[in-house]
Regions:
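Active-site neighborhood of HAD-like aspartate-dependent phosphohydrolases
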Residues: 2-46, 53
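Short, acidic loop-to-helix structural element flanking the phosphoryl-transfer center
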Residues: 4-6, 80-112, 118-122, 150, ...
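Short glycine/proline-centered loop/turn elements that form peptide/ligand docking sites
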Residues: 26, 97-98, 102, 173-176
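Residue-level detector of anion-binding/catalytic polar loops
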Residues: 37, 109, 186
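A metal-dependent, Asp-based hydrolase signature
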Residues: 49-84, 94, 102
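Substrate-recognition "cap/lid" segment bordering the active-site pocket of phosphatases
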Residues: 88-91, 117-185
Length: 189
């Protein structure tokens, strides 16, 4: 069968891996240093997905710090804690390993595009799937606009040698669906 698609691009958190435990754990450790929190995983579900700065802003607001008194101070604290514990209770969703290994068998390229800081995105993917499993992993970097801007997705397609029309984009949020659309890719989610 002639496959129309050459490349599968995945969001990381909430799509490939269940990271809500890690995000909640690291956020609460950070909040605790300022005498705030803790937040529940249910609360965190509504807070994450738009990068760590937005996550901290919303977390502080959820704890009553709406004037962002601790916002500047908490960012480096969170980054340090997250660097250590970004893979806390991290595991892939059911069926993901099967899906990605099947894709590899068929000769498709697989990529990850995430709003998670680049170093942690790479670290998490390597921790869960092993080194070199994905053809490319792109996290949030200086100078690359965050999703729903399509820059990351388009960069991944280019690295994988695929035209956007030959890419399937998998995600779990509205942000992801917009990203795929903006990149002119077929979205799944």
């Amino acid at each position: 069968a002639d496959m129309k698609y050459k490349c599968l691009i995945f969001d990381l958190d909430g799509t490939l891996v269940n990271s809500i435990h890690a995000l909640t754990y690291c956020t609460n450790l950070s909040l605790e240093k300022f005498g705030l929190g803790p937040l529940t995983e249910e609360q965190m579900m509504t807070i994450v997905g738009d990068g760590y700065k937005m996550q901290m802003k919303r977390s502080l607001a959820a704890c009553g710090d709406t004037d962002e008194a601790h916002y500047e101070a908490i960012l480096p604290v969170y980054m340090e804690i997250f660097g250590k514990y970004c893979n806390y209770e991290m595991h892939p969703y059911d069926g993901i390993v099967e899906l990605t290994s099947k894709a590899k068998e068929l000769g498709l390229k697989i990529a990850v595009v995430s709003n998670k800081p680049d170093a942690q995105a790479k670290k998490t993917v390597e921790y869960v799937f092993g080194a070199g499993y994905f053809d490319t992993v792109i996290g949030e970097q200086e100078g690359v606009p965050k999703k729903p801007d399509p820059s990351g997705a388009l960069k991944a397609a280019k690295i994988c040698g695929a035209d956007p029309s030959e890419c399937l984009y998998f995600g779990d949020t509205n942000t992801d669906m917009k990203t795929g659309k903006n990149a002119k890719m077929t979205t799944v989610g």
